[in-house]
C-alpha cells in the first residue's frame, strides 16, 4: 500500500538523519501480504516494527520478551531470532550483549520483596537494552476516532483485555465535540 511505502520512506529518512548511513541502511523492498510467512519465518528481515501488549503490569512482561535463551521470550524466538544465532567471531559481541541484558532481567526477576528495587533493576535492564540497540523504539501510535462514547467513562487499563468491556460507558447520540471532552 502507499501508506506502508510512505511510512517506510519516512523511517529510512529518520534512520539516515539520526544514525547515518555507514552502519544502518534501510533497504525498502516490495510489499508482502504476510510478514510472518514471507519475511520473519524464513528469516529475511534485518529488523521489524511491532508492538507488545502486556498481559500483566510487571515490567518483566515487556523486558522478558527479548531475553536470550528463553523459549517463552516472544521477540527473541519469533522476531530477532537471537537464540538461533551461531556464535562466531563476528557474532560474539552481539551474543554477549544479549547475555548481559538477560542477566540484568534475571536479576530484576529475582527481586520479589522490594518493589522499588525491582523496578530500579528493570530500569537498568531497559536502559541497557536501548543503549546497546538491542531494541530501538521508533514509533508510537495514537488512534483518533469520531465517537459517540465519552472515552473518559471507559475503563483505562494499561494491560490485559479490560479495555474491551462495555461497562458504565457514557454515550451521546449526537457525538462529542473537543470542547465537551476537554
Please identify what each model-predicted range represents.
Residues 1, 52-55, 143-145:
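Short, glycine-/Ser/Thr-/acidic-enriched flexible segments
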Residues 1-13:
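Bilobed "Venus flytrap"/periplasmic-binding protein-like clamshell domains
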Residues 6, 57, 146-149:
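Short, solvent-exposed loop/turn elements at domain surfaces
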Residues 8-11, 28-29, 63, 120-124, ...:
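Composition- and surface-driven signal marking solvent-exposed, interaction-prone regions
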Residues 13-20, 130:
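A general structural signal for alpha-helical elements within enzymatic catalytic domains
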Residues 17-77, 121:
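Periplasmic binding protein-like
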Residues 37-43, 64-106, 140-182:
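Short, solvent-exposed loop/beta-turn-alpha elements that line the ligand-binding surface or hinge
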Residues 98-149:
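Bilobed periplasmic-binding protein-like "clamshell/Venus-flytrap" ligand-binding domains
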Amino acid at each position: 500500500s502507499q501508506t506502508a511505502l510512505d511510512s517506510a520512506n519516512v523511517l529510512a529518512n529518520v534512520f539516515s538523519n539520526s544514525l547515518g548511513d555507514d552502519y544502518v541502511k534501510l533497504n525498502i523492498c516490495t510489499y508482502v501480504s504476510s510478514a510472518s510467512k514471507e519475511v520473519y519465518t524464513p528469516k529475511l528481515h534485518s529488523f521489524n516494527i511491532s508492538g507488545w501488549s502486556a498481559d500483566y503490569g510487571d515490567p518483566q512482561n515487556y523486558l522478558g520478551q527479548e531475553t536470550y535463551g528463553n523459549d517463552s521470550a516472544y521477540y527473541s524466538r519469533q522476531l530477532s531470532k537471537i537464540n538461533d544465532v551461531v556464535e562466531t567471531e563476528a557474532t560474539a559481541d552481539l551474543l554477549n550483549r544479549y547475555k548481559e541484558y538477560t542477566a540484568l532481567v534475571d536479576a530484576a526477576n529475582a527481586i520479589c520483596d522490594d518493589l522499588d528495587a525491582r523496578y530500579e533493576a528493570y530500569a537498568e535492564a531497559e536502559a541497557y537494552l536501548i543503549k546497546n540497540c538491542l531494541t530501538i523504539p521508533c514509533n508510537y501510535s495514537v488512534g483518533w476516532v469520531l465517537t459517540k462514547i465519552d472515552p473518559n467513562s471507559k475503563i483505562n487499563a494499561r494491560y490485559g483485555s479490560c479495555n474491551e468491556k462495555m461497562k458504565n460507558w457514557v454515550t451521546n447520540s449526537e457525538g462529542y465535540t473537543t470542547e465537551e471532552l476537554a
